Amino acid sequence: MISRRTAILSILAVGGVLSDPLPTLSQTKRADPFLGLDTDNDGTLDLDEAQKAAAALFDRLDINHDGTLDRHEVGSRLSAREFAAADVDKEGTLTKDEYLAIVEQRFKVADTDKEGTLMAKELQTKAGRALVRLLK
């Protein structure tokens, strides 16, 4: 028969091994900026992949399905100033073309080596994180 002390120590020992928490989904996303973006699995993000992700996000954010995003739908992805600058036609909303133009601008800023693709280290910069906010 196992003593109560032995049973408790066994539970604590197993608990100690198992107590290292698994990463949460948000931690995984932070650790892997490419999660779901690098569709050709080449380890980089190109402008086409970025624009496809941005277009898909645009469609998800367009809650009222009017083909544009207002400040509420964009949320914190853009500051009020950035939103106003991107709103070329000054209608108070962003069309998909206006949204994708911002994505292209941010992609070019994040592409510090000007190779036309973004590596993980480029996505972890301030400019890279600003781009990722428009993609996820």
Label each region the model flagged.
Residues 4-8:
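N-terminal export leaders
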Residues 10-17:
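Bacterial N-terminal signal peptides
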Residues 17-23:
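C-terminal segment of classical bacterial N-terminal signal peptides
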Residues 25-36, 41-60, 75-82, 100-106:
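EF-hand Ca2+-binding helix-loop-helix modules
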Residues 42, 62-66, 89-91, 111-115:
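Acidic carboxylate motifs that coordinate Ca2+ or other divalent cations, activating on Asp/Glu
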Residues 60, 78-85, 99-136:
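EF-hand and EF-hand-like Ca2+-sensor regions
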Residues 68-70, 91-97:
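Blade-edge motifs of beta-propeller repeat domains
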